[in-house]
C-alpha cells in the first residue's frame, strides 16, 4: 500500500523534468561538434527523408516548388510549361506566368543543386557518382512530369534542350537502341501536349511519354511498353468512376474491375499506373481511395495535400 501510495503521489505531481532531458555534459559535446569537420555529413541535405510513392500534383502551385515535395519524400514532381519567345515558363495557366518562374529557375537548377550535393567530389570514389536526390535510397529515381501546354512539337523540342544541364552530368534515365534502359537519378516524362511521335520512335533518348492508362489497348498504343512509358496516367473519375460513398469498400464491383484491368494491362508491359483527379473530399473517401490504389498496385499516388499523404505512410 505504501508503494502504491508513493506511485499515486508521483503521478499527481506530474513528470520529473529531469526525465528525458539531455545531460549538460552531452549538450556541451553536441554544441561543440556542430559544424565540426569531424562530424560533418557531406550528403546530409536529405539524409532523414524517406521516399514515398507519391506524385506532387500541380507542384508548381506550392510556395517552394520541388523542394516542398522533396521535403515530404515525394518521388514524383510536375511542371506545366509554356513556351514564349524561346523561354519555358511554369504555371497552371497563362495568367499565372511571371518572368521569373521558369522551368530552369524552379526545377532544372534546384534539381541540379540537390544532385550536386548528393554527389560531392570525394577521395574515396574512383569515378563520379550518380546518386539520386534521397540519401536514404540513392538509387530511387525522381519522376519529373513535364506537362506541355503550348504547341507540342515546338515546346517539347525546347524541353529537350532545357534538360541539357542534367544530361551532360549523366543524371537522366536513358534509352539506348530502343530497348536498353539505364536508370538515372531523374526520369523525365512528357505529358499534356507532348507529341507521341517525338518520343516513341526515338531509339536513343533521355525522356519518356506519359501514355493514357485507360487507352493502352487502343491500336495507337499497342506497342507501348515501359521503354516508352514507365508510367501511364488517366483521369480516375473518367476511367474508374465517381465516388458516391465514403464506406469500405469504396469502389463498386464494376469500378474495381475497371481499375484492376487497367493496372494489369499496364503492368504486363512493364508500365506503372497513376491516377489523377482522385477525390480530395470527404477525407475518409480520399483515404479509402488511396488505400485501394496502393493495394491494387499503382506506382504513384496523386496528391495535393502532401502533409496528409506523408502522414498516411
Residue ranges and their predicted role:
Residues 14-51, 60, 68-75, 82-313:
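Catalytic cores of phosphodiester-bond hydrolases, prominently lipid phosphodiesterases
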Residues 1-21:
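Fungal secretory targeting signals
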Amino acid at each position: 500500500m505504501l508503494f502504491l501510495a508513493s506511485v499515486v503521489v508521483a503521478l499527481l505531481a506530474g513528470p520529473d523534468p529531469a526525465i528525458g532531458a539531455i545531460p549538460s555534459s552531452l549538450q556541451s559535446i553536441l554544441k561543440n561538434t556542430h559544424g565540426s569537420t569531424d562530424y560533418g555529413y557531406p550528403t546530409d541535405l536529405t539524409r532523414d527523408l524517406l521516399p514515398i510513392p507519391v506524385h506532387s500534383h500541380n507542384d508548381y502551385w506550392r510556395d517552394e516548388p520541388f523542394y516542398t515535395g522533396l521535403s515530404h519524400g515525394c518521388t514524383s514532381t510536375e511542371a506545366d510549361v509554356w513556351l514564349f519567345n524561346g523561354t519555358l515558363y511554369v504555371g497552371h495557366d497563362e495568367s499565372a506566368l511571371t518572368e521569373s518562374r521558369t522551368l530552369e529557375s524552379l526545377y532544372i537548377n534546384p534539381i541540379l543543386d540537390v544532385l550536386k550535393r548528393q554527389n560531392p567530389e570525394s577521395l574515396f570514389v574512383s569515378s563520379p557518382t550518380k546518386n539520386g536526390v534521397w540519401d536514404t535510397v540513392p538509387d530511387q529515381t525522381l519522376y519529373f512530369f513535364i506537362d506541355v501546354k503550348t504547341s507540342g512539337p515546338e515546346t517539347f523540342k525546347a524541353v529537350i534542350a532545357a534538360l541539357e544541364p542534367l544530361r551532360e552530368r549523366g543524371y537522366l534515365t536513358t534509352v539506348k537502341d530502343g530497348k536498353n534502359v539505364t536508370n538515372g537519378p531523374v526520369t523525365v516524362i512528357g505529358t499534356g501536349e507532348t507529341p507521341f511521335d517525338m518520343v516513341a520512335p526515338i531509339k536513343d533518348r533521355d525522356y519518356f511519354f506519359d501514355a493514357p492508362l485507360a487507352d493502352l489497348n487502343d491500336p495507337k498504343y499497342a506497342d507501348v511498353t515501359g521503354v516508352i512509358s514507365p508510367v501511364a496516367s488517366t483521369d480516375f473519375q473518367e476511367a474508374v468512376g465517381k465516388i458516391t460513398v465514403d464506406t469500405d469498400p469504396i469502389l463498386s464491383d464494376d469500378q474495381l474491375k475497371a481499375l484492376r484491368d487497367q493496372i494489369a494491362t499496364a503492368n504486363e508491359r512493364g508500365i506503372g499506373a497513376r491516377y489523377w483527379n482522385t477525390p480530395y473530399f470527404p477525407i475518409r473517401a480520399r483515404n479509402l481511395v488511396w488505400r485501394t490504389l496502393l493495394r491494387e498496385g499503382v506506382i504513384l499516388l496523386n496528391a495535393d495535400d502532401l502533409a496528409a499523404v506523408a502522414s498516411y505512410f
